[in-house]
A protein has these predicted regions:
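Hydrophobic alpha-helical transmembrane segments
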Residues: 72-86, 202-217, 405-410, 482-503
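Transmembrane helix-loop-helix hairpins at membrane boundaries of multipass inner-membrane proteins
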Residues: 1-8, 15-111, 183-202, 206, ...
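Membrane-interfacial helical/loop segments at transmembrane boundaries in membrane proteins
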Residues: 58-66, 189-196, 389-393, 463-486
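Aromatic-capped, Gly/Pro-kinked transmembrane alpha-helices
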Residues: 463-496, 502-582
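Hydrophobic alpha-helical membrane-insertion segments
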Residues: 37-50, 170-179, 369-375, 445-463, ...
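Alpha-helical transmembrane segments and their helix-start/interface "positive-inside/aromatic belt" motifs
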Residues: 28-39, 159-168, 359-367, 436-451, ...
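Hydrophobic transmembrane alpha-helices and their helix-loop junctions in integral membrane proteins
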Residues: 91-132, 141-438, 455-458
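Membrane-entry segments of alpha-helical transmembrane domains in multi-pass membrane proteins
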Residues: 1-8, 70-84, 122-134, 269, ...
């Protein structure tokens, strides 16, 4: 049964993509209907698959000597990621029925979205590193194509190309790691690597560990390779929700969690993961606070929340990281889709041009506030329980300075959350009025996600059991729901974190009385608005690379004689090395 459900989770979206592509552009109603049907069916299949969690390979197809076996494994991490991709993905497709109603090239949009969803499900369920890499690259292509969906907009095209290039840097790290593993044990199977990782030479394991970390940094938009994600905001809003909540950015966190047992003892690796996570959490939160574009603010918020998950993995809290991944997928999809309803109604992303829209859009205001409650980590919302689990574990298992930095990040998160609510829905009305609240299809998705914000934390016990029973190499601490609640209430770190969050709210409330403090912080504000110079740093690397390539270009004379000399000389060197047994 699990074989069928896994194939349906991956294959149904891909089958839908093919059928929709073959329909042609004129069958718009049919495209909406089929995209919804196939995505929802895949979501249902993934939901049922949660009941078949196992660490055994249930589907194996031999692909020959060089490619190894294509395997699918329904373990806890895989079925969980597949469920997020397909269920949240199906809600974005339902939302798109209204949001994309007037858009041209609807066929291309739905085909790419469904291909994206299926690839993400395949990435999670794959038992082979090589085929995980294949699905990894398909998601990269889909993100590029969807970010560049409005291909007559130079900013959208540039954003898509940037996302593709940066994430390909991470893909190189994953591919190198996979090839090294194959060279060591003769297999691409993830289970084989986790079983034999302790036998690897230290320098080989270090190469794999930091290669996978580089892959995660690029894919999950962590500092310093985070700059592609804010530029991805040129995509249609359902696409940004898909990228930021249900699909691609989750892949890097999943990669680190998947291979944590094999890599955790590599010298310097866990502290590197912690530092990457806390820098991303703090710096991105500050950039979200300084942003006036609602979608860019939410993009920086995504980077920050992913930083919490990466930090959690660095401290060994694999369960907490994945639990927060679930919470974040829900409340961030809710926030992006709510913001999309606002943007479509008022025609701008600039929060400075909004204000008092809550009177015109009471439904959207309510669901956006629900999303911010979860983002800020207030009690009763899923974000509270998952974030507090991370902070509680970090209090015990990470350096104290790292824990304090994450606490500060929690306060900044509360600050920019209330800032977004205030600028969009309250205060003085600017020169924009909303034309509608939210059409029916949008309301279905937004209502479902709002309900999930208040209920998914009840799955903590079942989710913990799923992971612990199907991940033999991981040490998963399981808690029942009542134990989770009592544990968090009793933990001093919980109350300290809530105090920091409260201080964040107070800062915004008292902002007019703190103008002198804001004046003293102006250098930090300017640095934040400049993105802390990461874009300039990345551009500097590009310029150095271009300069080096111009030097190497001298060797390309274009003369056949010299080309033949180079080929023959290189062949002689290779043959000599082979003869010496190198």
């Amino acid at each position: 049964m699990s074989n069928l459900l896994m194939l349906l989770s991956i294959g149904l979206p891909w089958l839908g993509a093919i059928i929709i592509w073959l329909l042609g552009e004129k069958q718009r109603k049919t495209q909406h209907m089929l995209a919804t049907l196939f995505s929802v069916a895949a979501g249902i299949a993934s939901l049922f698959l949660l009941g078949f969690g196992s660490n055994q390979v249930t589907l194996r197809i031999s692909m020959g000597r060089y490619f190894g076996d294509f395997t699918l494994i329904p373990d806890g991490l895989g079925v969980f990621l597949s469920a997020i991709a397909t269920i949240v993905g199906s809600l974005t497709v339902i939302y798109s029925m209204d949001y994309m109603r007037k858009e041209a090239q609807l066929r291309r949009y739905y085909a790419l979205v469904l291909l994206f969803i299926g690839a993400m499900a395949g990435l999670g369920l794959s038992g082979s590193l090589l085929f995980m890499f294949l699905f990894w690259e398909i998601t990269a292509f889909c993100s590029y194509a969807l970010i560049s969906f409005h291909n007559d907009d130079p900013k959208a095209v540039a954003g898509g190309i940037k996302a593709l290039i940066v994430t390909q840097l991470g893909g190189i790290g994953l591919l190198i790691g996979a090839m090294v593993i194959r060279a060591q044990i003769g297999s691409y199977q993830i289970h084989d690597f986790l079983m034999h990782a302790r036998t690897f030479p230290p320098h080989i394991l270090s190469l794999i560990a930091f290669g996978f970390l580089a892959a995660a940094i690029a894919k999950s938009a962590q500092v310093p390779l985070h700059t592609w994600l804010p530029d991805a905001m040129e995509a249609p809003t359902p696409v940004t929700a898909l990228i930021h909540a249900a699909t691609m950015v989750n892949a890097g966190v999943y990669l680190l969690a998947r291979f944590y047992p094999a890599l955790s003892d590599v010298p310097g690796w866990t502290i590197s993961v912690i530092v990457v996570g806390l820098l991303s959490a703090i710096l991105a939160a500050l950039m979200a606070l300084a942003s006036n574009d609602v979608k860019r603010a939410l993009a920086y918020s995504t980077i920050s929340q992913l930083g919490y998950m990466v930090y959690a993995i660095g401290t060994g809290a694999v369960f907490a990281s994945q639990f927060h991944l679930l919470s974040h997928s829900i409340f961030k999809a809710l926030l992006f889709l709510s913001a999309g309803a606002v943007i479509q109604s008022v025609g701008t992303r600039d929060m400075r041009a909004m204000g008092s829209l809550g009177k015109d859009m009471p439904f959207v205001r309510t669901v956006f506030i629900i999303g911010c409650i979860a983002l800020a980590g207030l009690p009763i919302a899923n974000g509270f329980f998952s974030k507090e689990l991370i902070l509680e574990h970090g209090f015990v298992h990470s350096p104290r300075w790292a824990y304090l930095c994450m606490l500060i990040g929690a306060g900044i998160t509360a600050l920019y959350s209330v800032r977004m609510i205030s600028m969009i829905f309250y205060g003085e009305r600017k020169y924009i009025e909303a034309t509608n609240d939210a059409p029916p299809a949008m309301r279905v998705s937004l209502s479902t996600l709002s309900l999930a914000v208040f209920t998914t934390w009840l799955m903590a016990g079942a989710f913990g059991n799923l992971l612990s029973n199907s991940l033999p190499f991981h040490q998963i601490q399981t808690l029942k729901v009542d134990e989770l609640v009592l544990d968090l209430i009793a933990a001093p770190s919980t109350w300290l974190a809530l105090l920091i969050v409260l201080i964040g709210f107070l800062f915004w409330t008292l902002r007019t009385r703190l103008r002198s403090l804001l004046g003293a912080l102006q250098p930090l504000v300017s640095l934040t608005e400049a993105g802390f110079g990461f874009e300039q740093m990345n551009q500097g690397v590009v310029q150095v690379t271009k300069h080096l390539s111009s030097i190497l270009r001298i060797t390309q004379t274009g003369q056949l004689n010299w080309n033949v000399v180079g080929i023959v000389g290189g062949l002689c060197i290779v043959l000599t090395l082979l003869a010496w047994g190198v």
